[in-house]
């Protein structure tokens, strides 16, 4: 089943159910995609306007990046579900003999690594989404300024949610050095892009209330 082809109602119903997917990872990717789409909307409302003719080429370039990024995040909704399948299978392997225990440990380590790769990719995409939101807030139509702020907040939420999805998997890794490296990668993205998202929000809020 391709989760991205579900209706909004069906996706949310499945998210609320006991089904293994979608879960927090797929939901985070979808929220990030929505944030990027909001930014793209700001761009599309800006192009073709005489008032923003000087920014036309730059906005068109931002729109191209946003469209590609949205599609990337949409694909990550399904990728997160696909990554859960081998992880669930690994937990179900027998471990009665030393050989079975060794095999289960190896398979589980590989599955956990794969389960971390997707949320890290979502985080990377959300960082780009926050950068785009900052540009749209600065250069886009003032009539859609609030949407640029929403774009930053959506991507921020998805970024933080994905960091939690990294942490729940690294916590279970027996290779603690590798786990620490993945946690550090996530922490670096949070440290750099959460302040930028907050800056975009504060700037937008101040301009709207001026």
Residues covered by each model-derived region:
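Short, hydrophobic/aliphatic alpha-helical segments
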Residues: 3-22
């Amino acid at each position: 089943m391709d989760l991205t082809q579900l209706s909004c109602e069906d996706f949310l119903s499945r998210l609320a159910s006991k089904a293994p997917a979608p879960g927090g990872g797929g939901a985070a990717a979808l929220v990030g995609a929505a944030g990027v789409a909001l930014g793209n909307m700001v761009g599309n409302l800006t192009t073709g306007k005489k008032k923003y003719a000087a920014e036309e080429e730059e906005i068109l370039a931002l729109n191209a990046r946003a469209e590609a990024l949205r599609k990337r995040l949409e694909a990550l909704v399904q990728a997160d579900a696909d990554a859960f399948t081998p992880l669930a299978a690994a937990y179900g392997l027998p471990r009665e003999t030393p050989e079975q225990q060794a095999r289960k440990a190896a398979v589980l380590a590989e599955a956990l690594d794969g389960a971390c790769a997707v949320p890290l990719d979502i985080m990377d995409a959300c960082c780009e989404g926050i950068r785009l939101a900052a540009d749209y807030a600065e250069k886009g139509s003032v009539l859609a300024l609030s949407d640029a702020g929403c774009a930053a907040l959506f991507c921020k939420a998805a970024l933080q949610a994905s960091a939690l999805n990294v942490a729940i998997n690294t916590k279970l890794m027996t290779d603690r050095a590798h786990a620490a490296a993945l946690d550090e990668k996530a922490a670096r993205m949070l440290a750099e892009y959460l302040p930028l998202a907050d800056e975009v929000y504060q700037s937008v809020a101040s301009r709207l209330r001026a």
